[in-house]
Amino acid sequence: MSIFHRLFGLLNMDIGIDLGTANTLVYVKDEGIKVRQPSVVAVKKGSNEVVAVGDDAKRMLGRTPDTISAVRPLRDGVIADFEMTEAMLKHFIKEARTRDKGNGTKIIKASKIRVVVAVPSGITEVEKRAVKDPARHAGADEVYLIEEPMAAAIGVGLPIQDASGNMIVDIGGGTTEVAVISLSGIVQSRSVRVGGDELDESIIAYMKKKYNLMIGERTAEAVKIEIGSATVVDQETTMDVKGRDLVDGLPKTIKVTSKEIREAMAEPLSAILDSVKVTLERCPPELAADLVDRGIMLAGGGALLGGLDIWLAEQTGIPTHVAEDPLQAIVEGTGKVLNEISFLKKVTSAGV
């Protein structure tokens, strides 16, 4: 590498961000993923002074005193709280720029910071601006937006530049993004505001309705991860779920089965399936034929739900595969486009 390029690397910093409803990941060019934290901010009520961000804030969900509120700035894949999103981005970008030194830590200085942020496909111009502005206020000089399914497809290594169909289904915390991609462009896509959060909420509603048991988001997520599945498993499992009895208000433990949790998640899973089917139905015949051979690629945290690939393959008749590391797919995609400027401008909307 020339002296010029070494100096250029020191003067500029390129950052890719998967700004997710559930988690935020930050990729720094030539260094890889530097931040992987929950998209949660804890603040003092009244003053909105930030108390904690990320892992520390998530541990506070449902456990804060009256003076502190733990919030998730994004809902359904888009920004719900502008101020908190800006605070969170500032924290994560600062963390991505921080390096450990022998005598402490040091923030890497950069004359120019270029940021690529992944966003749901089909969001409005107002919603795009709501992403760009906090990123700029957090220190970015240039901000590019890339649609999440495109970023995920690039991240998992699909040959998107080929003249053939590639299908990606990215199931995040707030949205499910379905897209058919060919020649570096999205030919057909669908975004539904159903994701991991909706699965958690369906479990909360089920426990409340059937057992009069109130459980929190973290407990519901743990149940989903532990015994949740999209299809019948060889051996049904059980799990003790702790919560508050809605009748007498006392702590209570209920044993639930994987079959019950599968039933609880049936509605949001059906919505995800419908979005896949609609996208397939609207896909040009030649590209649809490609998908029979290439199959569907699953990415995002929701792809880790037990048996989801098997269930989707059964329901669509198309081979379905889970990405090697579905949680990192989008941020890896933002990282890859940062390495090629011409490609970056081709697959993203203009920087600001």
Predicted regions and their residues:
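Nucleotide/phosphate-binding catalytic cleft detector across ATP-hydrolyzing
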Residues: 1-171, 179-297, 303-352
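Acidic, divalent-metal-coordinating active-site segment for phosphoryl/phosphodiester hydrolysis
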Residues: 174
